[in-house]
Regions:
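Hydrophobic h-region of N-terminal signal peptides that target proteins for export
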Residues: 9-17
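Formylglycine-dependent sulfatase
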Residues: 2, 16-403, 412-433, 437, ...
Length: 480
């Protein structure tokens, strides 16, 4: 009898603990920079819902990602520096995250979570690289690095796919959707969340917007006719306001469904701004693709009522490699022998006075040419190791070394205007030595450098096969 009672107690307490695990929603936009928010000082952009979320959140104001998108996604998923996860580019097979690396979705699923992705994956097109093979239960994605894109090698989305009414791969089957892409991704994510009552969920919503080509519904572009010149600029800002509306809808539904108080809601972006950095860049140098502050420093908002502090800014140096250990920590997941590069941010969310030691972060633009690649992608120096010292940076709390010859004191010069390398040569030497050790460690792990390009485009091929054999059904717009 006592054994039975003990077993029942164990089952009850385990179920109670599982029920208390917070849901996790991670929203990541594409090519939106730190300055592309009204709450960060932008003079005319309209982001009322994100501004509201900003006021409710703990904000990491010194959070950094990679200069371009696929490397950031690899770091988020693997908890490792992108080069050490095999990702050095956004195309040419170099966007494929190395096989054998456990993902944050794998770890959360083992911790009792159901997992879903809605939007842009961009870490490999072959089935073994796709999210359904990397820990995701629910998959609703476009192909390639952008809707309608195609490049040499395996990357190729559905032919002639468009931001409006895109064809999406849903759990292995393609469907023809109705609506603007960002609206579609959020609606499907919300439909799925609404059905997840028995398990905590991890919903990853990496939007394709505001990545180019710059397209937005007319009502959103119209908001910027008096502020931005040209259709593309108006569309860029309109895409962000459209994202804002969808974040507002998500927040509303979380409240309606009684999920808000037990949901960690995270908002961030994948790299610095593309269009926006030319308009307002929060005083930073550089944008997407740059190894200056404007290429890597992006928003990171985290909200979970009862844990995070509303309106609290945290200036500790943080990076995308910290997201994996943070989510695992909050979910109570067992990492076992898994070694991650990052640190959990969870202690800072609970107590902002927690000791946070200085650290050294490494950045590289990647994107070197490849033998056999067409056009500009195959031109230039084809020796990878000759790019070791090209377009790299090293960051600590105080310093940013950009290349071998430029050192900025970020504490006193956040806009990177004054090179102080002559005053602090010992600092530059130390950072360069650390970078060289990083490159030596990462170089053998760049496993995609010699991958052949004369391969099938599996995402496109699967679409064409389904179209020929049974057709592409229409997606049912969710009723929320």
């Amino acid at each position: 009898m006592n054994k039975v009672l003990a077993l029942l107690f164990l089952v009850f307490t385990s179920a109670f603990a599982a029920a208390k695990k917070p849901n996790i929603i991670y929203i990541m936009t594409d090519d939106q920079g730190y300055g592309d928010l009204a709450c960060h000082g932008h003079p005319f952009i309209k982001t009322p819902n994100l501004d509201k979320l900003h006021s409710q959140n703990t904000r990491f104001t010194n959070y950094h990602v990679s200069p371009t998108c696929a490397p950031t996604r690899a770091a988020l998923m693997s908890g490792k520096n992108a080069f050490e996860a095999g990702v050095t580019h956004t195309i040419l097979e170099r966007e494929r995250m190395a096989l054998g690396l456990p993902t944050v979705a794998d770890v959360l699923r083992k911790a009792g979570y159901t997992t879903g992705i809605f939007g842009k994956w961009h870490l490999g097109e072959q089935d073994e690289y796709q999210p359904h093979s990397r820990g995701f239960d629910e998959v609703f994605i476009h192909g390639c690095g952008g809707i309608g894109q195609r490049f040499a090698g395996s990357q190729g989305d559905v032919p002639k796919n468009n931001y409006f009414h895109p064809t999406i791969r849903h759990n292995g089957k393609f469907v023809k959707t109705k609506g603007f892409c960002t609206d579609v991704f959020f609606l499907e994510a919300l439909r799925w969340m609404k059905t997840q009552k028995d398990k905590p969920f991890f919903a990853y919503i990496p939007t394709n917007a505001p990545h180019g080509p710059f397209l937005a519904p007319e009502k959103y572009k119209a908001l910027y006719k008096d502020h931005a010149k040209g259709d593309a600029n108006q569309a860029f800002f309109g895409m962000i306001t459209n994202i804002d509306d969808n974040v507002g809808l998500l927040m509303k539904k979380l409240d309606e469904w009684g999920l808000a108080d037990n949901t960690l809601l995270i908002y961030s972006t994948d790299n610095g701004s593309s269009k926006g950095s030319r308009v307002f860049n929060a005083g930073m140098k550089g944008g997407k693709g740059s190894v200056n502050e404007g290429g890597s420093r992006v928003p990171l908002f985290m909200r979970i009522p009862g844990t995070t502090k509303a309106g609290k800014d945290l200036g500790q140096l943080a990076r995308h490699i910290d997201i994996f250990p943070t989510l695992a920590d909050i979910a109570g997941a067992d990492l076992g022998e898994l070694k991650l590069e990052g640190r959990s941010l969870a202690p800072l969310l609970k107590d902002d006075t927690t000791q946070w030691l200085d650290r050294t972060l490494f950045f590289h633009g990647g994107r070197w040419p490849k033998k056999g690649a067409p056009g500009k992608f195959g031109k230039g120096d084809l020796n990878l190791d000759n790019y070791k010292y090209k377009k790299f940076a090293v960051r600590t709390e105080r310093w940013r070394l950009v290349g071998k010859e430029t050192l900025y004191d970020i504490k006193t010069d956040p806009s990177e205007q004054t090179n102080v390398i002559d005053k602090h040569p010992e600092v530059a030497k130390k950072l360069l030595t650390e970078y060289e050790a990083f490159w030596k460690r990462a170089r053998p792990l760049m496993v995609n450098e010699d991958a052949p390009l004369d391969v099938e485009k599996p995402f496109e091929a699967n679409y064409l096969k389904q179209k020929e054999n049974g057709g592409i059904p229409e997606w049912k717009v969710p009723s929320l």
